Amino acid sequence: MAKTKPVKVLFHSRGADQETAWCVPLAKRNLYRLDNILFLHATPTFGDVIEAKENAEGMLTCKRVVKPGGRFAMIVDYPRPEDFKVLVKLLRSHGVETEGMSKGRLYLAVPKALPAKDVFQLAAARVPG
């Protein structure tokens, strides 16, 4: 079976803080699975199923979360560029999805079974600062 090609979907807060992210179309019309971590919004989160429809300009736009994917958003800051790969490997080994946008900051989609406190402790034990 061929893999469905991701599409860009627009996310915003009442018109502000606009950003786009990759989403995978699902079988049911207007439903997509978020395949990125958003930088400007805590929700929706990686893996959530969302409803998206075209806006007046023809851009797919998120309308609502249909089914949560079981993750929450977090940010972990780190002091040195070489810490990025170390943290990504460590956190992914615990089921955490990661994305970097700017130096020193890692955006996370953490499984709800892993408490935020544990994520910070894991990171602090491996990376100084």
What kind of feature is each model-predicted range?
Residues P81-G129:
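Helix-rich terminal scaffold detector
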Residues L26-N36:
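Short, structured beta-strand/loop micro-motifs enriched in basic residues and often containing a Trp
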